[in-house]
From Swiss-Prot:
It comes from the Archaea. Its EC number is 3.4.-.-. It is an enzyme of class 3 (hydrolase). It is a multi-pass membrane protein. The chain crosses the membrane at residues 1-21, 29-49, 58-78, 80-100, 104-124, 126-146, 166-186, 187-207, 231-251, 358-378. This is Prepilin peptidase EppA. It comes from Methanothermobacter thermautotrophicus (strain ATCC 29096 / DSM 1053 / JCM 10044 / NBRC 100330 / Delta H) (Methanobacterium thermoautotrophicum). Keywords: Cell membrane, Hydrolase, Membrane, Protease, Transmembrane, Transmembrane helix. One of its GO terms (cellular component) is plasma membrane. Its main location: membrane. Belongs to the peptidase A24 family. InterPro entries: Pept_A24A_C_arc (IPR009639), Prepilin_IV_endopep_pep (IPR000045). The keyword Signal does not apply. Pfam families: Arc_PepC, Peptidase_A24.
């Protein structure tokens, strides 16, 4: 009975902490240390008490190991500018409270037992679910910013809808490639899904690169044949592909150029404040200062194009980083000095800190009630393929 109370109390505190952290992150842009540090201590205390009551020291040992491990992982991601410090400490707090999957709910749906558990520790399930929950939250958040303060980005966002003809042509080309793939694989002594997918991709690329008139004739002939063989499947397939292509293009727009513009502001050095996050790191090479936000893939492309591999290993000496912790007062003074000396322009791209705590809260709820979303997706893929 007491063990159940400890488990219920741990879940309640974790949910309450994540809820308050979400409110604070949205309202003030921070997750306060006065929340996370006491919760970490309380989690270790509760699991220590549980270990004593069950006469199993490994409960506390695993709790300490998982808590330290999640903090170390979070610290690495913080150094990589993926997470803010408050996010790291909130994940650590949840881990100290819930190092193992709580057995609060248990039900079955369509022959599957829920919540679905994974072979790895429960805190990793919370992290994975939080990351997956971030995508819909990011879409809603960015769209809200566009609608309220960046209306000029709406035209760019709606561009895929205006290109509905291009999307329809691509849907017809893919349908033609799928039809040809089925015809070809019927003559093969074996059926391999990966081979079929590769063949669909290659045929789509080949047909897309044909001259317009030849492409129109080939696609028309194949589509007519496909309609003759299975009218309903062909029509529904084309419509689903068309809608899917449009939705993917909308999401791609929202997550690339639109997000970059919506979640960044341009400011002068006198407008900079402590805690603001630069969009890119400031580097120095010799007497030259420059901002560089290129990814590793971008640098690989540049190296392949120019033959200069030095950019892969050395971009210069970091002067002011784009860490998620934000600018410090001394870094602002460094930027002010460089501007006054004419070394850099008085123009800085500042990232709006997107609150991650709500995604952590949603990820925790999903983990408790539904289970590991990654495992569910893997099972769905096994069923489909």
């Amino acid at each position: 009975m007491i063990l159940m109370v400890i488990e219920l109390l741990s879940v309640f505190i974790a949910l309450l902490a994540c809820f308050y952290a979400s409110y604070s992150d949205i309202k003030r842009g921070i997750i306060p240390n006065r929340l996370t540090f006491p919760v970490i201590g309380l989690g270790l205390l509760l699991n220590g008490a549980r270990a004593l009551m069950e006469s199993d020291p490994w409960i506390f040992i695993y709790t300490a190991i998982f808590t330290a491990g999640i903090f170390a992982l979070g610290y690495i991601l913080w150094r990589m500018v993926a997470w803010a410090g408050g996010d790291v400490k909130l994940f650590t707090a949840v881990t100290s409270l819930l190092p193992f999957q709580p057995s609060l709910v248990s039900y079955s749906f369509l022959g599957t037992a829920f919540p679905v558990t994974a072979s790895y520790p429960f805190p990793l399930t919370v992290i994975i679910n939080s990351i997956l929950a971030l995508l819909p939250f990011l879409l809603v958040y960015v769209f809200f910013i566009i609608y309220t303060s960046r209306r000029h980005l709406m035209d760019e966002f709606m561009e895929p809808l205006r290109q509905y003809r291009t999307s329809m042509v691509l849907a017809l080309v893919i349908t033609s490639a799928v039809t040809l793939t089925f015809l070809i694989t019927d003559f093969l002594p074996f059926q391999i899904i990966v081979l079929s997918l590769i063949l669909v991709y290659l045929l789509t690329m080949v047909i897309s690169r044909l001259p317009p008139r030849i492409k129109a004739v080939i696609v028309s002939v194949i589509i007519v044949y496909s309609l003759y063989k299975n009218f309903e499947l062909t029509v529904s397939g084309v419509v689903i592909l068309w809608v899917s292509i449009t939705v993917i293009q909308l999401i791609r727009k929202l997550l690339t150029s639109i997000t970059r513009e919506a979640l960044q502001d341009t400011m002068g050095v006198d407008e900079l404040k402590e805690g603001m996050i630069l969009a890119s790191t400031l580097y120095r090479k010799g007497d030259e200062y420059y901002f560089d936000d290129s990814s590793l893939l971008d640098r690989f492309r540049t190296a392949a194009r120019t033959g200069d591999v030095s950019a892969l290993t050395y971009r210069g000496e970091p002067v002011v980083s784009a860490m998620a912790a934000g600018l410090r007062e001394e870094e602002i003074e460094t930027l002010r000095d460089l501007v006054s000396r004419g070394k850099i322009k008085d123009e800085f791209r500042i990232r709006r800190g997107m609150p991650f705590a709500p995604a952590i809260f949603i990820g925790l709820l999903v983990s408790l009630l539904i289970g590991d979303l990654a495992m569910i997706l893997f099972r769905l893929f096994d069923i489909i393929f």
